[in-house]
A protein has these predicted regions:
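Short, Lys/Arg-enriched C-terminal cap helix and immediately downstream tail that follows
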Residues: 2, 53, 82, 104-107, ...
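Short, charged helix-capping/linker segments at alpha-helix termini
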Residues: 14, 31-40, 50-69, 175, ...
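Helix-turn-helix DNA-binding module
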Residues: 141-152, 156, 160-177, 191
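Internal acidic/polar
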Residues: 4-12, 19-23, 108-136
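Sigma70-family region 2
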Residues: 31-32, 55, 60, 69-86, ...
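Arg/Lys-rich amphipathic alpha helix in sigma70-family domain 2
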Residues: 76-83, 93-113, 132, 184, ...
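Short helix-capping/turn signature of helix-turn-helix
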Residues: 43-47, 55-58, 155-163
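N-terminal module of bacterial RNA polymerase sigma factors
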Residues: 1-48, 136, 141-144, 191, ...
Length: 200
């Protein structure tokens, strides 16, 4: 019998494998100075990097500057990619270093409303939008209350969609530590939201 879920899982795996091959090929071309490959790489990874950086900085203009710095670092360092991690986790690790360099001495903030307004989605009515904004404000406030390490980890796993292994590679810590920190972050976030009468 033909299981559609099994086939869709196989297709998703094949797509991910094809994407990884495409990314490695793009990096090879970028290392040779191919501007079209760099543009394709930016289209593929720019929004994910922007979302991750925005989660940490909370400032759209600053986040866009950091994305530009990150892509410049990719342009200059494409030949240094050794394939020990996924391309996505490699570029996010670069963005993480760029963000850390830019934020030295600055307070971290959460996602800004301008970023949220730019996100695609359905067009709910004004009442639903008002409730969604209120709930979102509660979650944003709760995330702001987390330790920076927890905010960053939540951003990597849920914001950027990295696997636990990829997040571990980016953070340069064992997968077990990622799991325990993620559990602690979820617990802390739930605690903060429960204190405010919300839950995840």
């Amino acid at each position: 019998m033909n299981d559609p879920h099994r086939n869709s899982g196989a297709a998703a795996f094949a797509d991910r494998r094809d994407s990884a091959c495409d990314d490695a090929e793009l990096l090879r071309r970028i290392s040779k100075g191919d501007e079209d490959a760099m543009a394709a790489f930016y289209r593929e990874h720019g929004n994910v990097v922007l979302a991750q950086v925005l989660l940490v900085t909370g400032e759209r203009v600053l986040a866009e500057e950091i994305v530009q710095d990150t892509m410049l670092a990719v342009w200059r360092g494409a030949a240094s990619f050794r394939g020990e991690s996924s391309v996505r986790s490699w570029v996010i690790a670069i963005a993480r270093r760029q963000t850390r360099d830019r934020l030295r001495g600055r307070a971290l903030r959460v996602v800004d409303d301008a970023f949220l307004a730019d996100q695609p989605g359905s067009n709910p009515g004004p009442e639903v939008m008002a409730l969604d904004r209120a709930e979102l404000a509660e979650v944003k406030g709760a995330i702001q209350g987390l330790a920076s390490a927890h905010r960053e980890l939540l951003g990597l796993v849920f914001g950027s969609g990295l696997s636990l292994r990829e997040a571990a590679d980016v953070l340069e810590i064992p997968v077990g530590t990622v799991k325990s920190r993620l559990s602690a972050a979820r617990t802390a976030l739930n605690r903060i939201l429960n204190e405010k009468g919300q839950d995840l």
